[in-house]
Amino acid sequence: MAASLPGPGSRLFRTYGAADGRRQRRPGREAAQWFPPQDRRRFFNSSGSSDASIGDPSQSDDPDDPDDPDFPGSPVRRRRRRPGGRVPKDRPSLTVTPKRWKLRARPSLTVTPRRLGLRARPPQKCSTPCGPLRLPPFPSRDSGRLSPDLSVCGQPRDGDELGISASLFSSLASPCPGSPTPRDSVISIGTSACLVAASAVPSGLHLPEVSLDRASLPCSQEEATGGAKDTRMVHQTRASLRSVLFGLMNSGTPEDSEFRADGKNMRESCCKRKLVVGNGPEGPGLSSTGKRRATGQDSCQERGLQEAVRREHQEASVPKGRIVPRGIDRLERTRSSRKSKHQEATETSLLHSHRFKKGQKLGKDSFPTQDLTPLQNVCFWTKTRASFSFHKKKIVTDVSEVCSIYTTATSLSGSLLSECSNRPVMNRTSGAPSSWHSSSMYLLSPLNTLSISNKKASDAEKVYGECSQKGPVPFSHCLPTEKLQRCEKIGEGVFGEVFQTIADHTPVAIKIIAIEGPDLVNGSHQKTFEEILPEIIISKELSLLSGEVCNRTEGFIGLNSVHCVQGSYPPLLLKAWDHYNSTKGSANDRPDFFKDDQLFIVLEFEFGGIDLEQMRTKLSSLATAKSILHQLTASLAVAEASLRFEHRDLHWGNVLLKKTSLKKLHYTLNGKSSTIPSCGLQVSIIDYTLSRLERDGIVVFCDVSMDEDLFTGDGDYQFDIYRLMKKENNNRWGEYHPYSNVLWLHYLTDKMLKQMTFKTKCNTPAMKQIKRKIQEFHRTMLNFSSATDLLCQHSLFK
């Protein structure tokens, strides 16, 4: 072994044989066990080691790490001679100061103890979070709390490719003694994620109480969105309340948290706790958003995004006496670098080419396991996003349980709901009266007196009721042979498959979701009746807006029917699945493994057309883009007024376009009807996985407060929007913040101006004027508080 002194930035690695392989280890000799020094702390500065551990818990560079034999935590001295071993006399001793051990945080090999053998670690699966581990968003002093970090999860036990999605978002702790009883008015649906329970105020802690002046709170939705002054006042008050609440959560003990051992239910009740205004820390989840996975690309753009996120954290911790102007704060956002079209196409092809299918054997042409790491950097976000987005738990709660000033303020939508909710609506496809005549949100109200077994039966009955059935029916009941013969697969997701067919001479989309079965579907557990019920009702509520009077729009995809069927997958659908797989490539498992008793939910939607992303080069002109923005803004504004709705995931894959012969499209907002030039296209909004809505005192939302992977994406403005939403609502996703709709409209406008090309160039004065208006819309829209505010006040829609 060479005896030269290491350079200042070099790292000492232990070698397990002589250089050039001239001398090999004796096969029968065991290595002596390594003993750590008794007192390591006296040799080092405690701040250096703590900083290293905070920077990356997964690294072995910490000199105080007892598990790293290369850095024993004390100055290097002469090695202890092993029994029977030889040490060359001419080998000089090395003296290495602790300063040389301050290495840059980066992924490194973890050396296992020699007595355990030197077998190579198995490669990570594509769905395994890659990159350095992150600290939990809660302060580390509460050792009894679970770490919400998704990357600490190990490999899935089931062995499926996406099987990790079930373990990524489940809590494994059991309730501690003395835990408060969960509130029955909150239903936590699913096993995918967890809702952090607020900690109670310690008995010995006394904080000064400050009363809030009711005059400073908005009295209606109009006042909440009418001007910048009221908006700033609302946000400052909400920020004060939330900082106190997060301070109370941090001050609790491990016994204050509510967890269930099965990971299915974790609930909180925050409104019954006494709110006191104090200097609370940052909200949960805010401390770790600045940590981003190492992608292997050290570029100025990445450093710029890190700096932008760091500035957001500094802004979030501004003292309460300092007022940050709302408009200036939003206009100074930093946009991450976007991928080129070539990069996006390459990533998509890699994703489709190298996905391991369930039950397939690896042949000589299969993707080699040792090359998984570069692929993980390419498709990590795509697969992780898919693995949890369709299996998010929906939180169903009462309005009083959501501590939001927006919620407690008098809402115009409350009176409108009572006026417009009890009328029969027309089926968009057939024109006949629909089987469901009014809202079904009341079905989500918790039944406090039911036991677990009765609750499960009740959920099944509710689903059957929405399907107008008494029990499951065969596939042939809703998909007769002539309908199946015309089926063509058009999409897929972790939830299942989407097919297109013809019903009554009209194209429709069929979405098939497996439920209540023991088999993993595409690596994830199947949904239950309890989990699928909110999905059905949300789709129905937004579809019903097409038949309302006071607030009406056809901008959300129409839901024609829902059925619960039982049986194995029909052969004609398998044939359509095979054709899609051979032409486009499928990332899903072939659905041929279901038994005869398998249950499915079959949702029939109107056919919405092609998504905006695929139409990026096919639109005629910027006038069409203006019509699309107008339709989207109007649809979101109507949903805000009627359902206090936030979409929260309106990327350009969730905007569908189809041709229409109508010259103008009609909508009604707060009783006032208006029209929009269609330019030959009708827009439909889809995918309500992350959405939030409220009706009849019931709030349904998706809690993503602990899902750090949602906020660490990179390479597109879309991922900045998730972080901006989190900053806007202080990571409290049950509250109503219509500004999130403005953020997504800004994202779509950005796409149209920078990543879409049009057949007709801006050569005429009229086209140039439209382009200037859209550019002005892009520059100024972040100063508006909601889609309703944009629609009514911005000059683009005048």
Curated annotation (Swiss-Prot):
Autophosphorylated on both serine and threonine residues. Strongly phosphorylated during mitosis but this does not appear to significantly affect its intrinsic kinase activity. Phosphorylation by AURKB is required for full activity toward histone H3 at 'Ser-3' in mitosis. The active site is at D649. Strongly expressed in testis. Also present in thymus and bone marrow and low levels observed in prostate, intestine, lung, spleen and lymph node. Expressed in fetal skin, liver, kidney and small intestine and also in proliferating but not non-proliferating cell lines. Residues 300-315 have a biased composition (Basic and acidic residues). Changing G713F: Markedly reduced affinity for histone H3 and reduced histone H3 phosphorylation. Residues 1-110, 275-350 are annotated as: Disordered. PROSITE patterns: PROTEIN_KINASE_ATP (PS00107), PROTEIN_KINASE_DOM (PS50011). This is Serine/threonine-protein kinase haspin. Residues 484-798 form the Protein kinase domain. PANTHER family: INTERLEUKIN-1 RECEPTOR-ASSOCIATED KINASE, SERINE_THREONINE-PROTEIN KINASE HASPIN. Its EC number is 2.7.11.1. It is an enzyme of class 2 (transferase). Belongs to the protein kinase superfamily. Ser/Thr protein kinase family. Haspin subfamily. It comes from Homo sapiens (Human). GO terms for biological process: intracellular signal transduction; mitotic cell cycle; mitotic sister chromatid cohesion; mitotic spindle assembly checkpoint signaling; protein localization to chromosome, centromeric region; protein phosphorylation. One of its GO terms (cellular component) is chromosome. ATP binds at residues 490-498, 511, 606-611, 649-654, 687-689. GO terms for molecular function: ATP binding; histone H3T3 kinase activity; protein kinase activity; protein serine kinase activity. Its cofactor is Mg(2+). Its main location: nucleus.
